[in-house]
From Swiss-Prot:
<feature type="transmembrane region" description="Helical">
    <location>
        <begin position="33"/>
        <end position="53"/>
    </location>
</feature>
<feature type="binding site" description="axial binding residue">
    <location>
        <position position="97"/>
    </location>
    <ligand>
        <name>heme b b566</name>
    </ligand>
</feature>
<dbReference type="InterPro" id="IPR036150">
    <property type="entry name" value="Cyt_b/b6_C_sf"/>
</dbReference>
<feature type="binding site" description="axial binding residue">
    <location>
        <position position="196"/>
    </location>
    <ligand>
        <name>heme b b566</name>
    </ligand>
</feature>
<keyword id="KW-0679">Respiratory chain</keyword>
<feature type="transmembrane region" description="Helical">
    <location>
        <begin position="347"/>
        <end position="367"/>
    </location>
</feature>
<comment type="function">
    <text>Component of the ubiquinol-cytochrome c reductase complex (complex III or cytochrome b-c1 complex) that is part of the mitochondrial respiratory chain. The b-c1 complex mediates electron transfer from ubiquinol to cytochrome c. Contributes to the generation of a proton gradient across the mitochondrial membrane that is then used for ATP synthesis.</text>
</comment>
<comment type="similarity">
    <text>Belongs to the cytochrome b family.</text>
</comment>
<dbReference type="InterPro" id="IPR030689">
    <property type="entry name" value="Cytochrome_b"/>
</dbReference>
<keyword id="KW-0813">Transport</keyword>
<dbReference type="GO" id="GO:0006122">
    <property type="term" value="P:mitochondrial electron transport, ubiquinol to cytochrome c"/>
</dbReference>
<feature type="binding site" description="axial binding residue">
    <location>
        <position position="182"/>
    </location>
    <ligand>
        <name>heme b b562</name>
    </ligand>
</feature>
<keyword id="KW-0472">Membrane</keyword>
<feature type="binding site" description="axial binding residue">
    <location>
        <position position="83"/>
    </location>
    <ligand>
        <name>heme b b562</name>
    </ligand>
</feature>
<keyword id="KW-0496">Mitochondrion</keyword>
<dbReference type="Pfam" id="PF00033">
    <property type="entry name" value="Cytochrome_B"/>
</dbReference>
<keyword id="KW-0999">Mitochondrion inner membrane</keyword>
Amino acid sequence: MTNIRKTHPLLKIINSSFVDLPAPSSLSSWWNFGSLLGVCLAVQILTGLFLAMHYTSDTATAFNSVTHICRDVNYGWLLRYLHANGASMFFICLYLHVGRGLYYGSYTYSETWNVGILLLFTVMATAFMGYVLPWGQMSFWGATVITNLLSAIPYIGTELVQWIWGGFSVDKATLTRFFAFHFLFPFLVAALVMVHLLFLHETGSNNPTGIPSDPDMIPFHPYYTIKDILGFLIMLTVLSALVLFSPDLLGDPDNYTPANPLNTPPHIKPEWYFLFAYAILRSIPNKLGGVLALVLSILVLAIVPALHLSKQRSMMFRPLSQCLFWFLVAILFTLTWIGGQPVEYPYIIIGQMASALYFLTLLVFMPLTSLVENYLLKW
């Protein structure tokens, strides 16, 4: 008799995606982050759902409702900090996942890569709107500063900002719509994840060597399911340690002060995972130029496949490109640090240099290095 998982209309989809899926035998732990992102998304949706049951999206009560969740709701403090720090884990896994794609040339699967970029934008938008909901000082002023950037768009900018705000400033209407979208977007992310996986399973996974692995495939279960479960345990251990020992480590103390439109905090900055983009935004003295640089800091990933000039797919056997890749990582750490510093000398010039090097590395140095490596290998 044929196994039900191979014949049932619904189960056979799951079977072909997670059980009998042929996978390269050489996948390293860097291939764990896709499944870890799935776990992060599930944790965020579940904790978010329970938080939404107690949260009120009104400027008069939003801050107090978050306090009420932490003090009066059974394990409300755990839900709130799992959700806040779960977002940090989400972005750590996201950036490592993108980094893996860049290093091993996974971007040559252009459909999967482009859906991934769309996912990155959607997750960033979701996280930004979520940061506004506790209605602390940094929530209010972060929302004001970031939404106000849209006013740099010629001709329609001012009207667009007022349309998003639902008035002439960030207020009750803004908070209500941000809550609505923050609740909706994770389900949009889940739908895009399905599309992402659909495109990935059309081509099959890449592997560390970048060489086609069709003759050497193994079933996803049990080999990679066990490997993924180990990844889940490690990530959930780190998340639990963060939540239970220092839940406010990655947060901003200003967000424990209720939002006050009459009092601007000395340093307005987003959550740590947006600091690199914020540093790129601030490094350009022109408002419209800054907004374009901010968008391009992520959108630049879309033209990486077109700039792949190497005859080899992966960087595994390309030491010069490896050096450049880790140089890029160092630049991103520098930008993250600069994004959290005040706008004064020497931070301004460091930020401008790091921003220029970020774009130059991706758009100029990496393609040129690929050509040099091709020449050295006489290809």
